Amino acid sequence: MTEHKSGFVAIIGRPNVGKSTFMNRVLGHKIAIMSDKAQTTRNKIHGVMTEDDAQIIFVDTPGIHKPKHKLGDYMMKVAKNTLTEVDAVIFMVNANEEIGRGDEYIMEMLKNIKTPVFLVINKIDLVHPDQIMPIIESYEKHMHFTEAVPMSALEGLNVDHFINVLKSYMPEGPQYYPDGQISDHPEQFVVSELIREKVLHLTSEEIPHSIGVNVDRMVKQSEDRVRIEATIYVERDSQKGIVIGKGGKKLKEIGKRARIDIENLLGSKVYLDLWVKVQKDWRNKVNFIRQMGYIEDQD
């Protein structure tokens, strides 16, 4: 009988290299927020992939960046601490971007850990196949990797192969989560992330890092209907106007798009009621950040 394998795998990389896209591709559900704007993942999100012979729990870390406020400090602390708690690390980079300072900073961190580190060259659909090997070699000049794997998370290219590679490095262990469970975050947190994703997609550059979403109330009204009330927090009055839009059109579109994803997640019809409030300088208020679910209670 084949031994069952299980392990925890961290996904790390500069902002927007496709970490969340990869995890959502593997899980088949939207768990990690996806956006083309930097610093969109604010919390460790555990995505659970269960197969007959293995279970891999993915940890999607905040994008590496230089902190500018207390929330940023916390995001960096989460990313660094995660590396010491896992069985393997995926260092993901973009095939169509040269090595930057952020990549070099991450590799300096990774040199000191003892767990297997996989270099994943993502977005290979954007470059010529002849470019892939030189890209891998350029990273290998900086540090040794357990294996280097080119892929396109968005297109699904080489993803299954990489999962098989990962499984071969996982230790023997039990199934930590039951079949069908794809995240260890409460549903309210995932719902708030889906709403925040739509705000990021539909608002201008002024808004993204100032956005926080809190699910105030989530009630199952019947077997196939859920009522959700949520508040979108911004830091300035001008931002509130941008999120709401002329005649409330922008907020209505945010709600419409979020509702579709939430219904797919919950498998129920959803009534979604959204509010927009100003909470000045909220990213520097530790208690408020904790209330929003971005800081875990620590001993």
From Swiss-Prot:
Domain Era-type G span(s) in chain numbering: 5-172
Sequence ranges assigned to domain KH type-2 in this UniProt record: 203-280
Compartment(s) of residence: Cytoplasm; Cell membrane
Statement: the UniProt record of this protein carries the keyword Cytoplasm: yes
Region ranges (G1): 13-20
Endoplasmic reticulum recorded as keyword: no
Location of the region described as G2 in the Swiss-Prot/TrEMBL record: 39-43
Binding site for GTP: 13-20, 60-64, 122-125
Gene Ontology cellular-component terms listed: cytosol; plasma membrane
Subunit record text: Monomer.
Physiological role: An essential GTPase that binds both GDP and GTP, with rapid nucleotide exchange. Plays a role in 16S rRNA processing and 30S ribosomal subunit biogenesis and possibly also in cell cycle regulation and energy metabolism.
Family statement: Belongs to the TRAFAC class TrmE-Era-EngA-EngB-Septin-like GTPase superfamily. Era GTPase family.
UniProt-recorded name of the protein: GTPase Era
Organism field: Staphylococcus carnosus (strain TM300)
